[in-house]
């Protein structure tokens, strides 16, 4: 647990006490809705949930306001269900159809309990509308703006994140191997051995045990950042831009709202090695229009201060809206009784 969390009043659910829940949480998915519904939130006038799965399913008082900051509708339940199923083991493939059918029903019911949705991107707002039939307001997530002095860029690309199949780090590894470009991969995960096997001599794996200072050093020195995966927003390209370098290789159908094509980075149109390699070559040939200072300045639109201000203003406005609705309802009920 981060040190600054220790001063908070953190109250966990009974799920925290289930043996091996921290390691086998995926297998215990059917228990998660019950765990969140067990929270007693009757003393709260405002409930703010941060959800990519089940936390939006908490139960609140009828006169309380529940605002959900939604990172995504549950990916493995909705549009990514078939992809997750295809990458699962045989036992998971056997039980997934029945379990996911039940989860879809519960997830829609849970979404109906939310009074107001905030989406972390316009892409997620579209998915909320698609699967929950709900409107949402967009507030982009935040990133710490690095104010370290710029250093001379070195001749390597960087990618950072968990090494799981949906991050598609394999595209970056194969593209840089094909182009004979140096790539530094920071992160650990189940795909590490597979990625090592396909990597050429220009690919370096640093694992997931680096300190924050070491990761920052690579961010500052890299000449470009590769982000080939499908994400709901994708905060790592913003982190790269705070260091003043371009995000070369972002797929435009997903998670690219933080990148200005041709100015602070490039998009590649298809999630293939060929498309990413072409994007890297364009970056090598043409560069980007913005300077390091301008790229960092663009990243300030995702600052912590901006996020805190927008979120507070939104919550206060929705609280006022909700109170007005309650007042209007009470007047209507009084008129009906009269």
Where are these regions (language model features)?
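Membrane-proximal helix-turn-helix segments that form the acceptor-binding/catalytic region
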Residues: 86-117, 125
């Amino acid at each position: 647990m981060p040190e600054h969390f220790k001063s908070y009043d953190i109250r966990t659910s009974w799920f925290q006490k289930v043996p091996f829940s921290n390691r086998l949480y995926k297998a215990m998915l059917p228990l998660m809705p019950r765990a969140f519904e067990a929270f007693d939130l009757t003393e709260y006038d405002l409930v703010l949930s941060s959800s990519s799965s089940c936390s939006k399913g908490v139960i609140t008082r009828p006169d309380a306001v529940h605002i959900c900051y939604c990172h995504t509708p549950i990916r493995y339940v909705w549009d990514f269900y078939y992809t997750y199923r295809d990458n699962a083991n045989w036992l998971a493939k056997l039980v997934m159809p029945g379990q996911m059918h039940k989860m879809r029903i519960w997830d829609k019911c849970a979404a109906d309990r939310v009074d107001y949705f905030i989406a972390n991107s316009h892409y997620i707002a579209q998915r909320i509308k698609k699967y929950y039939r709900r409107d949402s307001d967009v507030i982009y997530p935040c990133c710490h703006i690095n104010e370290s002095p710029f250093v001379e860029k070195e001749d390597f690309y960087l990618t950072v994140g968990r090494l799981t199949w949906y991050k598609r780090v394999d595209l970056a590894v194969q593209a840089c191997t094909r182009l004979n470009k140096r790539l530094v991969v920071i992160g650990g995960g189940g795909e590490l051995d597979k990625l090592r096997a396909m990597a050429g001599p220009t690919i370096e794996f640093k694992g997931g045990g680096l300190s924050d200072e070491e990761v920052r050093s690579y961010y500052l020195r890299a000449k470009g950042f590769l982000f080939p995966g499908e994400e709901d927003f994708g905060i790592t390209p913003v982190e790269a831009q705070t260091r003043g370098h371009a995000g070369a290789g972002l797929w435009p159908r997903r998670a690219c709202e933080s990148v200005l094509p041709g100015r602070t980075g490039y998009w590649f149109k298809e999630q293939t090695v060929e498309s990413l390699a072409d994007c890297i070559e364009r970056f090598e040939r043409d560069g980007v229009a913005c300077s390091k200072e301008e790229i960092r300045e663009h990243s300030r639109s995702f600052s912590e201060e901006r996020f805190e201000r927008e979120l507070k203003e939104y919550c206060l406005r929705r609280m006022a809206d909700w109170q007005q609705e309650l007042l209007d309802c009470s007047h209507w009920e009084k008129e009906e009784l009269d």
